[in-house]
Amino acid sequence: MNKVITSKEAILAISCKMAAKDGIQALNMRSVASACGVAVGSIYNYFPSKADLIASTIEMVWRDIFQMDEGYKDIYSFTDCVLWIFDSVCESAAQFPDFFTMHAMGISTSDKETGRRTMDRYLEHIKQGMLIALQRDKEVRRDAFDEAFQMEAFVEFVFGNLWTLFIQKQQSCDILLEIIRRSIYAQSHDEPR
């Protein structure tokens, strides 16, 4: 096989395409090298192990799904934030089917911890963005939160329910948005924007 000079980004782009088409379990050093048209050693130059390749691929998929820095900049409503996250995942679901379940099912035991750490890092980033949107939302009732009903716990609750909707492949988060509205906004709060 001719050695082709490539980059880590090019390898990850091919690896993501393979994961989207065949699932994360299809990734291994040989299959990625073959798809890239390079020797297996070229892949090892960038990724010392299959676990590193898979973790980097998962991280790239997360980056593609949640372009958080761009999406959160102009969101000042918590419900808009939740809807934006839901829509972002739904749009990406067609490209990366079963992404949320592939971590548990498609990664070998030795690779699961690396994949889990990568996923947890992105999920924490999402939750922090949700908390910021909640704190900036001027429509939230002043008495909505207290010691017994804290913002952080509410974000965890909403995110957990979003996650459930993703795994169930639901097409709408309307009921969750209504629960949010009834919980933290004044009764006269407008319908979804």
Where are the regions a protein language model picked out?
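Short, hydrophobic secondary-structure boundary micro-motifs
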Residues: 28, 98-103, 142-146, 192-193
